[in-house]
A protein has these predicted regions:
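Extracellular/periplasmic helix-loop-helix junctions in multi-pass membrane proteins
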Residues: 202, 222-249
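Aromatic- and glycine-rich beta-strand/loop motifs that create alpha-glucan
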Residues: 1-25
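Junction motif at the cytosolic side of a transmembrane helix
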Residues: 197, 255-275
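Helix-loop-helix units of permease transmembrane domains in multi-pass membrane transporters
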Residues: 92-125
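Secretory targeting signals
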Residues: 26-90, 94, 120-192, 196, ...
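Membrane-helix interface segments
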Residues: 16-17, 110-112, 116, 204-209
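Central hydrophobic cores of alpha-helical transmembrane segments
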Residues: 21-26, 205-219
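Juxtamembrane helix-break-helix junctions at the cytosolic face
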Residues: 21, 192-207
Length: 275
């Protein structure tokens, strides 16, 4: 198992698709930084008015996950995250079967080790391409803006004190950022698990990449129609929508969907003959 896992991680860090996904994410987050954070760093006091309820520009008001307009970069980012997470490495399952790689591998190791290693590395890759661009944006903002502690009474932020980790945001904002990045990291497991599951039936790399995105967007539309959009991953991963979220349902959704898709994926390995 360790040998197969090591090989898969080596393949990951040599994978062009991993760096393409990471690059797309970085383009979006760093463009937002140039348009918002960098501009605000040159005029930090412009947002402050001693006669009104306001505060100077800071890290948390300019950060990609929390900033105001332009919103297009954040909207695109959260919308295409399923594509980036799956394209990073999960599609190599399909490539391995189409190329005959697994036929050779199954003669030297147990296929359950390959399935487990592929799952671990694919989920890790998906989580990394989703969170590293956000971390880079946060660090960039920290380099040019002051870390002003958020004040709930000012009403400058989307979240309130009773929102998901809202109390943590207003007392220890960097801990809040870490917690939310962890949440986003693990939510990619849903999309990656679904893509790997689909790969056990379909050998079309394009379809495997797009299907989790399409299903995620369709579920968002359906949940919006029945006034339950807060349960959509598109909403859950957006830090500005935390007022509608509660810890229990958010974690339960992530665990249940990941276990469901991942469980069927591992069950399907019994039928895999490497053909």
């Amino acid at each position: 198992m360790k040998a197969v896992l090591k090989i898969e991680f080596q393949r990951l860090f040599r994978s062009v698709t991993f760096y393409i996904s990471m690059g797309i994410g970085l383009i979006l987050t760093m463009t937002q930084f140039v348009m918002v954070g960098l501009q605000e760093s040159m005029h930090i006091l412009d947002a402050y008015s001693p006669k009104g309820i306001s505060e100077p520009y800071g890290v948390f008001s300019s950060y990609f996950g929390m900033a105001g307009p332009p919103l297009v970069y954040r909207q695109i980012y959260y919308l295409i995250l399923p594509i980036l997470a799956v394209f990073a490495y999960a599609t190599t399952f399909c490539v391995d079967h189409n190329s005959g790689y697994v036929k050779n591998l199954y003669t030297r190791t147990n296929k359950k080790y390959y399935y487990a290693a592929k799952y671990i590395v694919s989920c890790t890759a998906g989580g990394l391409v989703a969170t590293i661009p956000l971390v880079v944006n946060l660090i960039a903002n920290m380099m040019v803006l002051p870390s002003l502690k958020p004040v709930a009474a000012l009403g400058c932020y989307a979240g309130n004190g009773i929102a998901l980790w809202g109390d943590i945001f207003y007392t220890h904002p960097y801990i809040f950022m870490v917690l939310y990045l962890i949440l986003i990291f693990f939510y990619q497991f849903i999309f990656v698990s679904l893509a790997l599951l689909l790969s056990t039936w379909v050998n079309n790399r394009f379809l495997i990449t797009l299907f989790p995105f399409l299903l995620n967007y369709f579920s968002y539309m359906m949940l919006s129609f029945i006034k339950k959009a807060k349960y959509s991953p598109i909403i859950i991963m957006d830090m500005t929508r935390i007022n509608a979220l509660r810890f229990g349902p958010v974690v339960l959704e992530c665990v249940c969907l990941t276990v469901l898709f991942g469980g069927v994926y591992f069950w399907r390995q019994k039928k895999d003959e490497g053909l």
